[in-house]
Amino acid sequence: MPGLYATPTAPLPFLPGVVVRSFVLQRGTESTLIYNSPGIDAAADEIRALGEPSHLLMNHWHEAMYGPPKLQVPALVHQDDRAHTEASLPVDGTFTARGWIGKDLDLEVIPTPGHTAGVTTFLWDSGEHRFLFSGDSIWVQGGQWKVVVLGDSNRADYLNSLALMRELDFGVLVPWGAEAGAPCFDVVTRGQARQRIDALIERVAAGSAE
């Protein structure tokens, strides 16, 4: 899609058949990275060609398992995930509330705790599409939207965050992980997004982990 670029993939160690990647948002004369993954260094030259990256925006601390990229870029994560992140990856700044990245008001930071305490979703308006970077909070498996409720996840927070995401205006869901060989994003209408998130809310409220 215009303005959105995906890095090469890397396997998710604890979930066979699932890969992760980072995304590059071309925003004027600079670029912004979403999600940490080995793909950043694999595509370092291509990323620089799109404009020197201003930030690496991390959805949650699990992304730190791959360590810091060699590409020099300030890493930001939510304050509530900072301690876990810094065990593996230096943090240059934190989010604490809903707000914007940069002056153009095109990239919004939206805390959506649940999967971890500091999960942060990013909503980007490219001018042509509205992308929701949902991390692991919502991903696609077998063509179906799913959640990832872990043993240490907060189910009540997760439900509140799903309700918040249901009201966001977006047309492209972009998770961190995807099945190997499957598309890395899902294009939907606003009605479809609401319907699918309603189904997630129902399942999580009933005790489902996915």
Can you annotate each of these PLM segments?
Residues 38-103, 192-203:
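Active-site HxH/HxHxD metal-binding segment of metal-dependent hydrolases
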Residues 22-26:
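Short, surface-exposed beta-strand/loop micro-motifs that present aromatic residues
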Residues 14-16, 38, 92-94, 155-156:
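Short gly/ser/thr-rich secondary-structure transition/capping motifs
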Residues 17-19, 95, 116-118:
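Residues that act as N-cap/strand-start positions at coil-to-secondary-structure junctions
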Residues 2, 6-9, 14-15, 30-33, ...:
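Metallo-beta-lactamase
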Residues 14-20, 42-43:
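Short N-terminal binding/cap micro-motifs at the start of the first secondary-structure element
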Residues 27, 36-39:
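Conserved beta-strand-loop surface patch within small alpha/beta domains used
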Residues 18, 102-105:
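Short, solvent-exposed coil/turn segments
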